[in-house]
A protein has these predicted regions:
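Terminal low-complexity/charged segments
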Residues: 1-222
């Protein structure tokens, strides 16, 4: 008898795994290969300690201590002319490292160069807000908290950005179910019609591959 495998979200699963597959890696280059980055690196190391530094995809990548993040952003903006924060977020490494990797993508309009700041944040720690330096960090920091649960200190309006304020858990964590949890399946029914309508409507269908001809009729029964 064949071993049973769960059929939930089958469209998200690879149909087979190649035993000869080798995960692709991005080459890293020495900073001395770029004259502008070499000067930036030299100035940076005089002011801050670095955990790692390299060039990747034409970006200068600097791995720093999360406690220095506000001073580093000030330095990049005022001293090294990286005057635009174009992206920031976090990566969930809770299972492997019990924390998050935060990254801040910077652009220098005068040098036409991009620099990425990376730092590690333990699960129960918090990072300082940089909204006082870059206004564009406001929504990004809120999204980081909303989707991943990253705590940000001294933010002017630290609340959820995308999900409702009373939403349970953080949807972009790797432990969050692809179809959502039980609270998610009943959220809109409870909010709009009340829990007494659960037996009439049924839980929300959250499997994107499911096709049910009755979905369009259920609300009509109210």
């Amino acid at each position: 008898m064949r071993k049973y495998t769960p059929k939930d979200n089958v469209q998200r699963q690879a149909p087979f795994s190649d035993r000869f597959f080798v995960s692709p890696s991005v080459p890293r280059f020495d900073i001395s290969n770029d004259e502008i980055f070499s000067k930036d690196y030299e100035s940076f190391t005089k002011a801050f300690k670095l955990k790692d530094a390299y060039i990747e995809h034409t970006h200068l990548v600097l791995n720093v201590d999360k406690n220095d993040i506000v001073e580093i952003m000030n330095f990049l903006s005022n001293e090294l002319e990286y005057d635009m924060l174009i992206e920031m977020s976090a990566i969930d490494y809770l299972a492997a490292k019990d924390g998050y990797e935060l990254f801040y993508e910077m652009l220098s309009l005068s040098k036409h160069k991009r620099l990425r700041i990376k730092c590690f944040l333990n699960k129960d720690d918090a990072v300082e807000s940089i909204t006082s330096i870059f206004d564009s960090a406001n929504w990004s920091e809120r999204e980081m908290y909303d989707m991943l649960g990253v705590k940000v200190l001294n933010h002017p309006n630290m609340k959820r950005l995308i999900m409702p304020d009373d939403w349970y858990d953080h949807p972009l964590r790797k432990t969050y179910p692809l179809q959502g949890d039980e609270a998610a399946s009943w959220y809109e029914v409870d909010k709009i019609f009340g829990k007494e309508a659960r037996d009439v409507i049924g839980p929300e269908q959250r499997d994107p591959a499911a096709i049910d001809r009755y979905d369009t009729e259920r609300f009509a029964r109210l």
